Structure formats: structure tokens, C-alpha cells
Design a protein with these regions (language model features):
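Short recognition patches in nucleic-acid-associated and regulatory proteins
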Residues: 6-59, 63, 67-75, 101, ...
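Generic signal for short, ordered secondary-structure residues
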Residues: 26, 112-115
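Flexible coil/linker segments and helix-coil junctions enriched in charged and small residues
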Residues: 70-113, 133
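Basic nucleic-acid-binding interfaces
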Residues: 123
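His-enriched metal-coordination microenvironments in redox/metal-binding proteins
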Residues: 1-7, 203
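Long, compositionally biased interface segments
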Residues: 181, 187-203
């Protein structure tokens, strides 16, 4: 199946990189458990290029996951409270509303995401190294600032993301011009310090 790809560019040079490097499933081995690795596009000062950077879990992000779950739980409680009480003599189960089904799904998904994030924090609690570039393994890298990707924009113009291109001075931009890629995605295993395990395919 093909997927839309976004392109990073620069306002002052011909830099052009896709975001497809973040695709695929990467995980840490925590004993016999596979713990999902979070990644994002970032800048590696060692590679002097854009690349895939680890995103290490932290307390603030865990709190955000928790609040998201609590929000969905509160909305679901309101929906359930608004339903008329079931008649004792009625033998059939009342059919759930679409809103209730959607909220139950959101609660389940948010609870799963929170549990996975908490497991990642536990697995990496004794980690010594900082987030790494997954191409070269360097810790001298940083994640790009938060930005949106308009995969389905009617007019896909390059949009600055608020990051100066190191060594160039231009502003990095992102846009999606309907280009789609059909790639075979592979799983990649890493140790708890973010190093690719032997036998896995390098970035």
C-alpha cells in the first residue's frame, strides 16, 4: 500500500529530504519484551543532515497521555449518564449509540497508549545516554520543533517549521505534493541505550 510522503526543504538552499525515514516499527528489547521506540525527524550535527531521532519518554508526556485518557473517560461517563434507565421487564440489551461506541474505542486506545508509554519509561529508567540519531548513533542531535504536515492540502506550498538550517541560515520548510511511496517496512531492534542490535538492518 502506498503512503503519502512529506518533503523537507530549505528557503536558502536545495536541501530536499522525505519524512519516510520515520516509517516502520522500531523497538527496544527489555528482557523478552518488545517496547515500542518513538521517533521523529530531527537534525544530526554529526551527519550534518536531517535524520531519524529517538524521542525518549518523559513525565510531562506521560501526564498528557493520562489526561487524554481521563478526558475520554469523562465524556463516556456523560454519555452513559444521559441514557434512559433500562426497563426491568425488557429482555433485550439496549443498542449502544454511535457516540458511545466511538468513545469506548477511544478510551480503550488511550488506555493502551498510556500503558505502552509507561512501560517505555520503566524500560529506559536507567538509561545513561541521551536520544540518538538512528543513522550514526550520535547523541549530538535534536528533534525538530512541533509542526503539522498537510498531507491533503489543496495548495501544497512549503511552510516554514521554525527551525534554522544549521550551517546555511535558511529556514526549513515542509510540504506534501501528492507524492506517494510504496515501501516494504521492516522491524528494527535496539538495546536500551538506543544502539541497533547486531543482525538488524542499519538506518
Amino acid at each position: 500500500m502506498s503512503m503519502p510522503v512529506a518533503t523537507y526543504g530549505c528557503t536558502a538552499c536545495d536541501l530536499s529530504r522525505w519524512d519516510a525515514g520515520t516509517w516502520g516499527y522500531r523497538y527496544y528489547l527489555f528482557g523478552d519484551i518488545k517496547v515500542r521506540m518513538l521517533v521523529a525527524t530531527g537534525w544530526c550535527h554529526t551527519c550534518v543532515d536531517l535524520g531519524v531521532i529517538e524521542v525518549l519518554p518523559d513525565a510531562d508526556s506521560e501526564l498528557a497521555y493520562q489526561r487524554k485518557l481521563e478526558t475520554f473517560q469523562a465524556e463516556l461517563s456523560e454519555v452513559l449518564a444521559a441514557e434512559p434507565p433500562r426497563k426491568r421487564w425488557w429482555p433485550f440489551q439496549a443498542r449502544k449509540s454511535v457516540k458511545q461506541e466511538n468513545l469506548e474505542y477511544e478510551v480503550e486506545s488511550a488506555a493502551k497508549a498510556l500503558a505502552e508509554y509507561q512501560l517505555a519509561r520503566k524500560a529506559l529508567s536507567s538509561r545513561v545516554s541521551r536520544a540518538r540519531c538512528l543513522r550514526c548513533g550520535s547523541e549530538d542531535c535534536l528533534r525538530l520543533p512541533p509542526h503539522q504536515v498537510g498531507y491533503y492540502d489543496m495548495e501544497p506550498l512549503p511552510v516554514p517549521i521554525g527551525f534554522e538550517h544549521p550551517g546555511c541560515g535558511g529556514q526549513l520548510t515542509i510540504h506534501c505534493d501528492d507524492l506517494r511511496l510504496n515501501m516494504r517496512l521492516t522491524d528494527k531492534a535496539y538495546d536500551l541505550e538506543g544502539l541497533l542490535l547486531e543482525g538488524a538492518t542499519p538506518e
